C-alpha cells in the first residue's frame, strides 16, 4: 500500500469514527422492534437498537482466534464493520460469516489474534450467581471506554403470558446502550451469556407507577454454543467453577484482550426501528 492509499484508509476510518462519536443519536442498545417468536423479547422488553444514523457502536468478544460474537442488530445492514481499539489504537475490519435473526446473533471473522473466552456449561449456573457485564456503555457520553458492572442472576425471564423463556435469563448488573453484544462473565472468568435486552423501564413505569431499575436480560451460553456449531469457531461447554471467585478488577484484567467495541457504519436503517 503506497502513502496515498494509507492516507485514504486512515481518512476513511477517522470519518467513520467521527460519524459515530459526533452523531447526536448514537444509541446502540435494545430495538423496540423484535419478531414475536420464542427466541425474541416481547414488546415489554427493549432489545439493545441500531441508530438511524450512519454509524453506531456495540460490544463483541472473541470465542476463537480470529472469530468474534456480537448481537446481530449491532452489525446488520452494515457496509463497514470495525473492531477495536487495539493496544496500538488501531481498528480492524471484520466480516459477518453467520447470523441468526431469531436469537439476534452474529459471528464475525477478524484478522486479529486475540485470546478467546470460554463458554460455560449453563447447566452448572445457579440462580443468584454473581455476574459481570463488560462492554462499551453510552459511547456518545462516556467515549469508547470499556466498563465493568456487577450484579447477580435474578432468574429466568418470564414473558407476558407468565411462561418461562428458557433461552434468556434476568440479571441485575447495570446495562446501558453500547453494552449490546457484550459478554456476561461468571466469577471464574467464563462467559455465561450475551447482553441483549432490558426492561422498557419508562414504559413499564407509565403503566405501574413503579420504576424498575437494572432489569436486563441475556441469552444463555447454551444458545451461544449451539449457534457456533459447525462453524470455524465451534466449541464445547466448559465446566463452571463455583469455587473460583475472582474480584471485578481481576475479571476485567483476565478478559482485557478478548472484548472490544464493534463499530458499524450502516448502509441503511432497519425498517420500523426507532
Report the location of each language-model feature.
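N-terminal secretory signal peptides that target proteins for export/translocation
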Residues: 1-15
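Bacterial N-terminal signal peptides
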Residues: 16-29
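Sec/Tat signal peptide C-region and signal peptidase I cleavage site
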Residues: 30-34
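C-terminal cap/linker of serine protease catalytic domains
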Residues: 35-48, 116, 137-141, 191, ...
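A conserved glycine-rich beta-strand in the N-terminal activation segment of trypsin-fold
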Residues: 47-71, 90-93, 115-118, 181, ...
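Conserved active-site neighborhood of the chymotrypsin/trypsin-like protease fold
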Residues: 57, 64-143, 165-168, 230-242
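Residue-level recognition of beta-strand microenvironments
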Residues: 65, 97-99, 156, 187, ...
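Flexible, gly/ser-rich surface segments that form the specificity/activation loops bordering the active-site cleft
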Residues: 117-167, 175-179, 195-206
Amino acid at each position: 500500500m503506497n502513502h496515498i492509499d494509507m492516507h485514504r484508509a486512515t481518512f476513511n476510518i477517522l470519518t467513520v469514527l467521527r460519524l459515530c462519536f459526533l452523531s447526536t443519536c448514537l444509541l446502540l442498545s435494545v430495538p423496540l422492534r423484535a419478531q414475536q417468536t420464542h427466541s425474541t423479547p416481547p414488546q415489554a422488553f427493549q432489545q439493545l437498537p441500531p441508530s438511524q444514523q450512519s454509524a453506531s457502536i456495540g460490544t463483541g468478544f472473541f470465542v476463537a482466534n480470529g472469530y468474534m460474537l456480537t448481537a446481530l442488530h449491532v452489525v446488520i445492514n452494515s457496509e463497514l464493520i470495525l473492531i477495536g481499539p487495539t493496544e496500538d489504537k488501531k481498528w480492524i475490519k471484520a466480516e459477518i460469516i453467520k447470523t441468526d435473526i431469531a436469537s439476534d446473533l452474529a459471528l464475525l471473522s477478524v484478522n486479529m489474534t486475540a485470546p478467546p473466552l470460554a463458554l460455560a456449561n449453563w447447566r452448572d449456573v445457579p440462580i443468584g450467581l454473581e455476574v459481570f457485564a463488560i462492554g462499551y456503555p453510552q459511547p456518545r457520553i462516556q467515549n469508547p471506554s470499556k466498563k465493568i458492572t456487577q450484579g447477580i442472576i435474578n432468574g429466568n425471564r418470564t414473558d407476558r403470558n407468565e411462561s418461562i423463556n428458557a433461552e434468556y435469563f434476568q440479571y441485575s448488573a447495570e446495562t446501558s446502550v453500547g453494552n449490546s453484544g457484550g459478554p456476561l462473565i461468571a466469577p471464574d472468568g467464563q462467559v455465561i451469556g450475551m447482553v441483549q435486552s432490558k426492561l422498557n423501564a419508562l414504559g413499564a413505569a407509565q403503566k405501574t407507577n413503579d420504576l424498575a431499575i437494572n432489569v436486563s436480560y441475556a441469552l444463555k451460553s447454551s444458545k451461544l454454543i449451539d449457534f457456533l456449531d459447525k462453524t470455524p469457531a465451534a466449541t464445547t461447554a466448559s465446566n463452571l467453577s463455583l469455587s473460583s471467585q475472582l474480584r471485578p478488577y481481576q475479571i476485567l484484567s483476565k478478559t482485557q484482550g478478548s472484548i472490544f467495541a464493534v463499530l458499524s457504519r450502516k448502509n441503511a436503517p432497519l425498517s420500523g426501528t426507532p
